[in-house]
Amino acid sequence: TLPHLKSSRGMIVAVTSIQAKIGVPQHTGYVASKHALQGFCDSLRLELKGTGVDILTVLPHWITGTDLRKKAVGKDGNELGASSRKHSKDAIPVGDACKAIIKAMAKRQQELIMPPKLKALLWLNLISPRAADAVITKAMSRQHKQ
C-alpha cells in the first residue's frame, strides 16, 4: 500500500519497453500500452515527489530467456507460440537484465534503458524524428527478413 511504501521509502518498478518512447511499425497496440504506462509512471513520479517513494521505469530492448512470446496470446486470443524470428544481437539475457535493474534500484534511478546504446536513438528521435524513423524502419525490415 502507499502508506507502507512511504514509511519504508519504497520504490515502484515498472518494466515497460524502449517502445514506450519510440514508435515501431506493426506493434501499434503494444507501443500504445507502453506509452500509456510510461506516462502514468512519469505523472506518478511527480505526484509522489518528496514522499520518499521513487519510481523506476525500465525500458529494455529484447530480453532473452523469458519465454514471453511462447506464452503470449494474439489478437484472436490464441497462444502465439514460439517465434521463428531471431532476437536482435543486442538482446539481453534475463539474468543480466535483473542485475541491471537491481543496480538501478540501489542507485534509486528514475529510468534504466537497456542496452544503454539505445539512448542515442532516443536523442536522435528528439533531434530528427525522420532520421529516427528511418533507423527504426531499417532495423525492423532486417528483423522481419530473419
Positions of predicted regions on the chain:
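Amphipathic alpha-helical dimer-interface segment in Rossmann-like NAD(P)H-dependent oxidoreductases
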Residues: 1-10, 45-46
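Hydrophobic alpha-helix immediately C-terminal to the catalytic Tyr-X-X-X-Lys motif of short-chain
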Residues: 36, 40-48
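Conserved catalytic-site region of short-chain dehydrogenase/reductase
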Residues: 4, 20-22
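SDR active-site lid
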Residues: 50-116
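Active-site helix of classical SDR
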Residues: 33
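Residue(s) in the substrate-gating loop at a strand-loop-helix junction
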Residues: 17
